[in-house]
């Protein structure tokens, strides 16, 4: 939704918004260092959530539980805590080798949720796969947060809409 000049200059569209492992604010490099101090150089969590299936994700500490609710998580568990966005992104990249970082939104909306997934067990499996250099960020004794959402029924079919083509 940004014009090109804004897209390449706004801190809101920095590469690290979608790819935290590319953040350079911790090295003093940013489109807007004041913005980065509030968004990138703050505590971040790496989390495991259950939407349709399990996924790994990153969010600022101030965005818990908002991020989980935005993504439609029915369960979520903090995995690691870091002092900045870059560190959280590096852990997420390691974990994406073993667990998705995407929400299967079609299955989620149809309520096809794999309730058999044990987030505590999954966390232990992921810790065992995590590079040693990231283990000091791992959190212990975290509780699983659970969420439920009001609904009348679930759709049988779900498809995306191109809002630019609606009513065209």
Question: Residue locations for each model-derived region?
Answer:
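Non-catalytic accessory segments flanking enzymatic or RNA/DNA-binding domains
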Residues: 1-168
């Amino acid at each position: 939704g940004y014009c090109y000049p804004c897209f390449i200059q706004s801190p809101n569209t920095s590469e690290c918004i979608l790819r935290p492992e590319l953040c350079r604010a911790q090295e003093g490099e940013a489109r807007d260092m004041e913005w980065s101090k509030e968004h990138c150089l703050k505590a971040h969590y790496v989390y495991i959530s259950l939407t349709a299936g399990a996924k790994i994700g990153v969010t600022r500490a101030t965005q818990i539980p908002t991020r989980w609710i935005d993504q439609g998580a029915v369960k979520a568990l903090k995995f690691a805590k870091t002092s900045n966005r870059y560190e959280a992104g590096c852990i997420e990249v390691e974990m994406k080798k073993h667990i998705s970082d995407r929400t299967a939104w079609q299955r989620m909306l149809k309520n096809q949720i794999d309730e058999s997934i044990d987030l505590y067990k999954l966390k232990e499996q992921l810790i065992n796969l995590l590079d040693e250099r990231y283990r000091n960020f791992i959190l212990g004794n975290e509780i699983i947060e659970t969420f439920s959402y009001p609904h009348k029924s679930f759709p049988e079919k779900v498809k995306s809409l191109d809002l630019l083509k609606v009513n065209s």
